[in-house]
Amino acid sequence: EGLDKAGGYGAQGLGMALLEGLRALGGRLVFGEFLGVEREGGWARSARIRREGREEAWPFGLLVLAPGPGLPRALRALGHPLPLTAEPHFKAWFPDPEGRFPREAPLLIWNEPQEIFAPEERALLEEEAELAPLLGLLPPGAHGRPEGEGFLALYNPLPREEAAPSGCLPSPPPFAGEVALRGLFPLLPGLRALLGVRPRVDGGYYVRTPENRPLLGPLEEGVWVLGALSGYGVMAALGAGNALAAWALGEEVPAWARAFAPGRFLDPA
């Protein structure tokens, strides 16, 4: 049922539904830092966890690593560094008491290249080194949707890559919110009235492999991984998790699942 109806949830609602399902099955949520595994005879037997300033060893029969943007760090702790990159992406929430972004609108996407600054604005900004790459023709992809008493604007036209982010929450550049807002002007010109309004900006990392296929499958005996879902994590997570669970339990898996196995980076063929 959860898989069939996953599209009816937002990201937070989906997370809460999964947490409630875990608790209903007797699972519990424990906070800590994953430090690696302890091995006996070459096999991983327990996870090393730091909790409340103490390091603990948690024995397991099967360990699944699904740490989202923490995946590069978790793989390094395991001694399995794989060729991953992390792209910081940001979203901006703008208050919209006048309803300039229609409340009944679906997710809107502008799928054409665009220039987000007028010629007179570009003349004023061309000496700003950080803004210079944004002054020309930018790729498509600006999107937004209503949320609460405002709307979310998302546009990362020139994403950068980080090989080893130190955390899960990148710091947004000061202009991230305005860039996202300007990206929606072709769709909703009335949003120009919100220039100068201070948005709430946050973000995270899109972790990806070189060919932009996820990691799903065994890393070593007893250790499995699910991650590098790029920018489609919420959409793909439940189907991917279902496939990984079936595989780990020795059940039949979809033919496509094995194409995502992390061993592809170790197989010369």
Task: Map each language-model feature to its residues.
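C-terminal lid/capping helical subdomain adjacent to the catalytic/cofactor pocket in oxidative enzymes
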Residues: L219-A269
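Active-site lid/adjacent beta-loop-alpha segment flanking the redox-cofactor pocket in flavoenzymes
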Residues: P97-E221
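Central helical "cap/lid" subdomain
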Residues: G53-L125, P173
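Mid-domain beta-loop-alpha active-site segment that forms a flexible
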Residues: E1-G21, G68-G70, A176-G183, L229, ...
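Internal, well-ordered alpha-helical segments in soluble enzyme and binding-protein domains
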Residues: G10, L14-L18, E33, W43, ...
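Active-site catalytic microenvironments for nucleophilic, acid-base chemistry
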Residues: G21-L25, G70, A77, A243, ...
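Hydrophobic/aromatic beta-strand patches that form the interior of the parallel beta-sheet core
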Residues: V30, V64, P214, W224-L226
